Amino acid sequence: MRRNPSTFKYIPLRIDFMSEVPLPEVNIGLVGHVDHGKTTLVAALSGVWTDRHSEELKRGISIKLGYADATFRKCPECEPPEAYTVEEICPIHGVETEILRTVSFVDSPGHEMLMATMLSGAAIMDGAVLVIAANEKCPRPQTKEHLMALQIIGIDKIVIAQNKIDIVSRERVLENYQEIKEFVKGTVAENAPIIPISAQQKVNMDALIEAIEETIPTPERDLDSPPLMHVARSFDVNKPGTPPEKLLGGVLGGSLSRGRIRVGDEIEIRPGVKDERGNWNPLFTEVQSIVASGRFVDEATPGGLVGIATKLDPTLTKSDALVGNVVGHPGNLPDVLTSFTMEVNLLERVVGLDEEMEVEKIKMNEPLMLAVGTAITLGVVTSARDDIVEVKLRRPVCADKGSRVAISRRVGSRWRLIGAGIIR
């Protein structure tokens, strides 16, 4: 039997630092093949190593979505690109740098087994840095798959970071550059700037920041509509053995796509949780505090990643249990869908494989993995005619008509991206 969520009192979360820098205003994804240097690049720009999970540290790969904020600055005395930095004091002239903006980085796992995690993270990205290592032939399977995922989800503000230039010859860097140009031809990244860097040695970080500033602008935000937040992580922040009277409520992590959520607001979480009868019920709770960029704030707005502390029983939020839910004011959220019809646009070839394979038409009774917002669900095809497909979902989603869907099919032992859908 679950404890009543309202019995969980609020005790402030420990905050590691307080800062006067602006709150993050844009979410930028780091995507690309496993071991090409995404996490190292986030650390070079933000000072935060996003692999904190014990298994991640042991295996040396990202498993969960990682998050870190970085404040981009500009030296008033340097010429571009040297003027761009994350340092408060210019290392060349010793003068104070001017703040441009703070960005939130979403570090996606590059391993093929973790594609669903990458798709979930892509739902909250405003733009992306595609990291491609110069010491391997381009494209690698997940380089292809991640770029196609960005295209399917509608992310077209892309910068390419050609990483690891410090461990290859100049000739190899130029050869790899041509491989990248050939690879992105005809894709959403065809005109993306390609910046040669070494994340490990922090080489050309200034040129990369300049490219991000010029290529990935902060989108216009809708602050007046009812709020809608996509949950990308959820936590129980209590240490084992915490006495019941000191337990903290569950924490939701994610990003708002519109509106504002304030401390003290009543919120609804859909689809919610499954009861003993197999029915899904929304959760209702109160916002106890909001953390953004390492500090408490009174309200959450679109742009950047936020943590919302609630009165929910922490067993409901532990281990990312509420990922894929959406949060808003009660009665103002999209419908919960147990099935939907979508207009489908299939790729010509399956991406993520070493060998080429054509995408066959979707068939009746076929299981598909569907990414809708931050939700990943399985759907069984109940009708398939031309480009209109109906699916019955194993786990419901909360989504508006017109929402994009990334569609994956089982190929061998893995789910592979095969196309995009629009909910009708």
UniProtKB/Swiss-Prot annotation:
InterPro entries tied to this protein: EFTu-like_2, eIF2G, eIF2g_C, eIF2g_dom_2, eIF2g_GTP-bd, P-loop_NTPase, Small_GTP-bd, T_Tr_GTP-bd_dom
EC number(s) recorded for this UniProt protein: 3.6.5.3
GO biological process: formation of translation preinitiation complex
Domain tr-type G: 23-220
Domain of life: Archaea
Region: G4, residue numbers: 163-166
Keyword annotations: GTP-binding, Hydrolase, Initiation factor, Magnesium, Metal-binding, Nucleotide-binding, Protein biosynthesis
Residues involved in GTP binding: 35-40, 163-166, 198-200
EC class of the enzyme, as a word: hydrolase
Binding sites annotated in the UniProt record for Mg(2+) 2: 35, 60
One Gene Ontology term of the molecular function aspect: GTPase activity
GO cellular component assignments: cytosol
Segments for region (G3): 107-110
Region (G5): 198-200
Cofactor needs: Mg(2+)
Gene3D superfamilies xrefs: P-loop containing nucleotide triphosphate hydrolases (3.40.50.300), Translation factors (2.40.30.10)
Similarity-based family: Belongs to the TRAFAC class translation factor GTPase superfamily. Classic translation factor GTPase family. EIF2G subfamily.
Protein name: Translation initiation factor 2 subunit gamma
Organism: Archaeoglobus fulgidus (strain ATCC 49558 / DSM 4304 / JCM 9628 / NBRC 100126 / VC-16)
Lineage: Archaea, Methanobacteriati, Methanobacteriota, Archaeoglobi, Archaeoglobales
